[in-house]
Amino acid sequence: MATESILITTLPMDFNSQMNNVTIGLNDNETLCENWREIHHLVFHLANACFAAGLVIPSTLNLHMIFLRGMLCLGCTFFIIWAVLFRCALDIMIWNATFLIINFMHFVYLVYKKRPIKVKNDLKDIYHRMFEPLHVSPELFNRLTGQFCEMKTLAKGQTYAVEDKTSVDDRLSLLLMGIMKVSYRGHFLHTISANAYIDSPEFRSTEMNRGETFQVTITADENCVFLCWSRERLTYFLESEPFLYEIFKYLIGKDITTKLYSLNDPTLGKKKKLDTQPSLCSQLSVMEMRNSLASTSDHEDGLQNFLRGTSTTSSQRHNQQEFYNAYGVGPLSHAVFC
């Protein structure tokens, strides 16, 4: 006891006054705090309420990250007010000011990412028709059409490609406005309307075989406007965007299928639309895609008869089967499509 009294008398007066509120107990049932301090100011509780509200925002909400950062910013602001006006605590103010700056910068970044992105007026129609239904974002579409894509025009009568002369390795084009006609050795095959790829069969074919030339002639039937991608740069871009790569595979396959049907029915290009055709297997070459009809007969009469077709059901079925046989896919069945 004498030792304990000596220790207490040597302690500072401030410490002795604080010890009055504390009882050091030997039993587990005794409490450490005898007298609790008063409740903090309302601003302190508002800060914690903001933190709690931000943490319980469901992640399924579209803007949940923006709301979370906003509530954290508000909570840090209340803590700074409480530390400056009611506690005079410099350390609390500095820490919360740091947290406020970090959260506010992230908040601004998230709001910037959510800004409405506009598609160019010239490309709105092609975006809404082809890419938006496949959930391609405007931001990704603008990247696709802005970096290595040019908008070009062709006057009526000008040629986009000449058979056996124009290389197929350089570009891929998408027709925005106008009509083009495709012919083989002077024989009309089909038309290409707006919102369709101009050279999709050649693009698919050159994935396997490079150095080929167009086997058909493509001519503007009226004034045309089209998007033109550099083949090499487009390939590199799609390799870095797997989602967009799959979208391109689907759209090109669908476009090739439409062209196949229009070969068998030349009126299809102008009067009908195939909106839900399946994609075609990539093994078909350019010659098989557009010129197989000519390979069925070396005579002009045979080609003309095949292209012309008849109105009877039996002749239509015969021409359709001959069409698929010319492509080298055997009996007519759904198994030929991917």
Swiss-Prot record:
SUPFAM superfamilies: cAMP-binding domain-like (SSF51206). It is found in: Lateral cell membrane; Cell junction, Tight junction; Membrane. GO terms for biological process: epithelial cell-cell adhesion; heart development; positive regulation of locomotion; positive regulation of receptor recycling; regulation of cell shape; regulation of GTPase activity; regulation of membrane potential; skeletal muscle tissue development. Glycans are attached at residues 21, 29. It is a multi-pass membrane protein. Residues 62-65, 113-338 are cytoplasmic. Belongs to the popeye family. This is Popeye domain-containing protein 1-B. The lineage of its organism: Eukaryota, Metazoa, Chordata, Craniata, Vertebrata. The gene is popdc1-b.
